[in-house]
Regions:
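Bacterial N-terminal signal peptides
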Residues: 7-15
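A structural boundary/capping signal
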Residues: 22-402
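Positively charged n-region of N-terminal signal peptides that target proteins for export
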Residues: 1-7
Length: 402
């Protein structure tokens, strides 16, 4: 088991020191696990910069000036060294900042102070972040050039700033509650934030649980024991709805991959490509219960492939993402993602088209329906209700382009 120890010294007034990994525990050391890595830092609560006044631009400016006089650069340096060593995507790096801020200023103790610490650490890590306040709420935004849905954003100087903490409030009526931006200039905070997740943490073997997944393929039962990590749910709890290009390329973690993909490949041995894709289509269709996001989560939630394996239910978008991932990993065939007004499905390009073909840019793709329907649809069969419906090709995967 590989555990990297990251020593953070957060003595915000008395000074900061970075010690070698795996130092002896001592009084005042705080230790927490960050998805398989042990993070340790020294922190004296008496050195914390307080924020007890009302929400105002003046009080936030005072907080910024006070914390800027502390030896925060060593803290940020260690955070960035972690980023350089482990190469987490921005979303994972933000989770590290959240956990570090929680150790300094617990969220339940003082939400405003906790949010300001997150904003400060993210800004000093080079990201273009900003704040907006109403009479009693504080919103934390980060600049992003990507298409992000279902959460608020602000525009400033032609740039989009996406809210990072909207989930903490549930919902806000922005017509009734007015927010004012607190635009504090932070030097070198110019980097745009990316919501793309291209890798998951290494985790530790002990973090995984084994889940039995089964389905029936033409009168034969197939059983899988898949290793899954519940922490993946935590990583994506507040993850927003992103565009399909980002969403469909979120990978499996290594343990989950190694417990599922080789087993699928073994079962596919001896099948031709068409039958193999049919097998993967039916695995995705019948190994999981169907439930709409609004019923399961109360809102739209696009799940990553590993989340679909973790949860007991999923909708058409979730299954499309899992099926896409499996076909990509095992056969690496060209695919297009079709978005209908109330449905999402996948079409695969075979050597020769099968059944109902979708023509896109001169190529013919065969529809493969990974979501259970009233009829037992074969490869190349489109839902009858969709034959006259308009659709949009929202993502194109061409192996030659990767």
């Amino acid at each position: 088991m590989k555990i990297a120890a990251l020593i953070l010294s957060l003595a915000l007034i008395t000074g900061v020191s970075v010690q070698p990994a795996f130092t002896q525990n001592h009084e005042g050391a705080v230790r927490f696990n960050f998805y398989g890595d042990t993070v340790v830092f020294d922190f004296d609560p008496a050195t914390r910069v307080e924020f007890d006044g009302p929400l105002s631009a003046e009080n936030i400016q005072s907080f910024y000036e006070a914390i800027s006089k502390t030896d925060y650069k060593a803290i940020v340096s260690v955070l960035l060294k972690y980023k350089e060593q482990h190469k987490p995507d921005d979303w994972l790096f933000y989770q590290l900042i959240r956990k570090a801020a929680q150790q300094i200023s617990p969220k339940a103790e003082n939400y405003g102070r906790y949010t300001l610490y997150k904003w400060f650490l993210l800004s000093k890590s080079g990201y273009d972040a900003t704040l907006a306040i109403s009479n009693h709420r504080i919103l934390f935004y980060v600049q992003s050039d990507e298409n992000i849905y279902n959460i608020p954003f602000r525009m400033r100087d032609g740039k989009q700033y996406v809210c990072l903490n909207y989930h903490d409030y549930g919902s806000i009526d922005f017509d009734k509650e007015k927010f004012t931006e607190v635009a504090i200039k932070t030097p070198d905070a110019q980097k745009a934030f990316s919501y793309k997740v291209t890798s998951l943490p290494g985790f530790t073997t002990a973090d995984y649980e084994e889940k039995d997944i089964s389905f029936n393929y033409y009168q034969t039962d197939y059983h899988f024991k898949v290793k899954l990590n519940p922490q993946v749910k935590t990583i994506f709890t507040n993850y927003p709805v992103v565009d399909y290009a980002s969403y469909f390329n979120i990978p499996l973690s290594k343990e989950t991959y190694s417990s599922l993909i080789p087993s699928l490949k073994k079962n596919l041995k001896g099948m031709n490509t068409k039958n193999g894709v049919d097998y993967l289509m039916r695995f995705t269709r019948y190994a999981f219960l169907f439930e709409k996001d609004t019923d399961a989560f109360g809102k739209e939630k696009r799940m990553s492939p590993e989340e679909t394996l973790l949860y007991g239910q999923s909708d058409c978008e979730d299954r499309a993402a899992l099926f896409f991932y499996l076909v990509k990993e095992i056969y690496n065939l060209p695919m297009i993602v079709l978005a209908y007004p109330k449905h999402v499905t996948i079409a695969v390009k075979f050597d020769k088209p099968i059944g109902h073909a979708i023509v896109y840019n001169g190529s013919k793709y065969s529809v493969c329906e990974p979501t259970p329907q009233r009829d037992d649809l074969q490869v190349g069969q489109l839902l009858p209700d969709l034959k006259k419906s308009s659709y949009e090709v929202v993502y194109v995967y061409n192996p030659q382009a990767y």
